Amino acid sequence: SFIGSAPPERYRALVRLARDAHMNMLRVWGGGVYEHDAFYEACDDMGILVWQDFMFSCASYPDFDEAFVAEVAREAELVVKRLRNRACVALWCGNNENQWIDDMCHTHDPQVPLFGQRLYDEVLPGVVARLDPTRPYWPGSPYGGNDHNSEREGDRHNWQVWAGQVYPRRFGE
């Protein structure tokens, strides 16, 4: 897909809409792009926090390929150096839905590796710890305990909102 070009005023207007709607955090999704500086400037100016994903989403990644791992580390270093002085960046997140999809497909089978796990557990948190140690790193979203889409810990993606598949909240509903 092609990303359109938006002038800084457009970023400011959209962030202002989020602020005026009483939002306090926006997520830069791992299946998208690292946003333009105008986005982060607007968030800084308007007090909006940013949940910043690294650009890994809904896929397997060849963490057994050392050249690929080195490229990921270089990209992460550039991104963290670029954004670490921004007041708006609240946390770094390793990926979007990769652990959860692995859980869904492989039902926790230890014989089936999650390609990319090394990136989320070693490479990316290592870069963040070295270059931006005051901010938290979260391995993925959703992520929590042994069930990456747990209702009891971590963060959760609720896929039951589609096509009226909402689960009951309590017995009898």
Please report, for each region that a protein language model flagged, where it lies by residue.
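Active-site-adjacent substrate/metal-binding segments within catalytic domains
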Residues: 1-59, 68-91
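Alpha-helix N-cap and loop-to-helix initiation/capping positions
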Residues: 6, 64-71, 111-116
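Active-site beta-loop-alpha junctions enriched in small/polar residues
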Residues: 31, 55, 96-97, 142
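Active-site environment of divalent metal-dependent phosphoester hydrolases
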Residues: 34, 99-102, 143-146
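Extracellular glycoside hydrolase catalytic/binding regions
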Residues: 108-111, 115-173
